[in-house]
């Protein structure tokens, strides 16, 4: 008996779906909830009115973003500047630098 009582909600949902399909087939679309309510008016060339919650959320997300960028730059700057160390210029030869030998006139 308890198995049948668990199936009762599914029967109710199925009945509602069938009634909705029959109503659409008969041309009766039911209640339309799309019009007549309060709408946000468009604001041409004006800033939108933000709520305090939206301002706080925006500040929090932008702070989190900049914290992450600066943290990663500070702790892993090779990702931005490159992975290879700059060679020591004192070990370069004159030939590599394009300087002609001293004995050549």
UniProtKB/Swiss-Prot annotation:
GO BP term, pick one: proton motive force-driven mitochondrial ATP synthesis
One Pfam family matching this protein: NADH_B2
InterPro entries with a match to the protein in the record: NDUFB2_animal
Primary location: mitochondrion
Domain of life: Eukaryota
Region (Disordered): 86-105
Biased composition (Acidic residues): 93-105
UniProt KW keywords: Electron transport, Membrane, Mitochondrion, Mitochondrion inner membrane, Respiratory chain, Transit peptide, Transport
Record's subcellular location: Mitochondrion inner membrane
Statement: the UniProt record of this protein carries the keyword Transport: yes
Bilayer topology: Peripheral membrane protein
The protein's assembly and partners: Complex I is composed of 45 different subunits.
Functional description taken from the UniProt entry: Accessory subunit of the mitochondrial membrane respiratory chain NADH dehydrogenase (Complex I), that is believed not to be involved in catalysis. Complex I functions in the transfer of electrons from NADH to the respiratory chain. The immediate electron acceptor for the enzyme is believed to be ubiquinone.
Record-stated family: Belongs to the complex I NDUFB2 subunit family.
Protein's recorded name: NADH dehydrogenase [ubiquinone] 1 beta subcomplex subunit 2, mitochondrial
The organism of origin for this protein: Mus musculus (Mouse)
